[in-house]
Amino acid sequence: MASGNSLRVQQQADFARTLCHLILWAQQQGMTITLGEVERPPILAELYASMRKGIKDSQHLDRLAADLRLYLSGVYQEDTPAYARLGEQWKKLDKRARWGGDFPKPDGNHFEFIDEERV
């Protein structure tokens, strides 16, 4: 395995562990969380970009992003503000953590790691 691949695997492991911490924290707060999309194939990223529903270089391509599904009192939350507590907690967990609710076009259920060079 090349060193670049080893680094990517370590980043993916760090992301997965940090995501677990967020989900456990959310459960302690009385939230119900399920997983949405984590890995996105390149062809799907290109399709989403052409439809203006995503970007071609999404962190999902490297398994460094997850779309979470938040349920409060059994009701799925679709609006970004419902995810604000999760987003704030996520950003506290790791310097690489970025929340989609902070994007110019907010994507509240999106949680990702950015490359360490960009931190």
Task: Write out the residue ranges for each language-model feature.
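Catalytic cores and adjacent binding grooves of peptidoglycan-active enzymes
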Residues: 55-119
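Second-shell loop/turn segments in exported
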Residues: 4-13, 72-79
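Secreted/periplasmic proteins that engage bacterial cell-wall peptidoglycan
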Residues: 11, 17-56
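Intrinsically disordered, low-complexity
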Residues: 1-6, 24
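Generic alpha-helical secondary structure signal
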Residues: 13, 17, 81-84
